[in-house]
A protein has these predicted regions:
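A short acidic-Thr-Gly-centered motif at the start of a beta-strand
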Residues: 1-7
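Aspartic protease core domain of the pepsin/retropepsin superfamily
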Residues: 7-9, 14-97
Length: 97
C-alpha cells in the first residue's frame, strides 16, 4: 500500500479489536488526526499496555485496486506501519471461516 509516496506494511490481525496506525506514518504523511475525549489502554501481544489518545478518522486505504475507508487509532506498532483489526473486517463482512 502507498500513501503520498510511502510504501506501508500492513498486518491484518484477527486478534485485534480495532485498527491502528504508527505515529511515525501519521507524521511522515502529515495525516490529520483528532484526540479522543477520553484516552484508553490497549494490551499488546507482548502483554505490555499502551495508552491510545489520538486517531485518524476515515483514512482512505488502497489495497491493490480496492479503495475503502478505515478509522485508525494511533499507536506504535513496531515493525508494521498499520494494523487492520476486527472493526474493519466485521464492517466489510470479511470474516474468515
Amino acid at each position: 500500500m502507498y500513501d503520498k509516496g510511502q510504501t506501508l506494511s500492513i498486518l491484518i490481525d484477527l486478534g485485534a479489536s480495532f485498527s491502528y496506525i504508527s505515529p511515525i506514518i501519521v507524521e511522515l504523511c502529515k495525516l490529520v488526526h483528532e484526540k479522543f475525549d477520553k484516552s484508553w489502554m490497549v494490551q499488546l501481544a507482548t502483554c505490555t499496555k499502551r495508552k491510545v489518545t489520538n486517531y485518524v478518522k476515515d483514512y482512505e486505504l488502497l489495497m491493490n485496486d480496492f479503495i475503502t475507508h478505515v478509522d485508525l487509532n494511533i499507536l506504535p506498532l513496531g515493525s508494521y506501519d498499520m494494523l487492520i483489526g476486527m472493526d474493519w473486517l466485521e464492517k466489510h463482512r470479511l470474516m474468515p471461516n
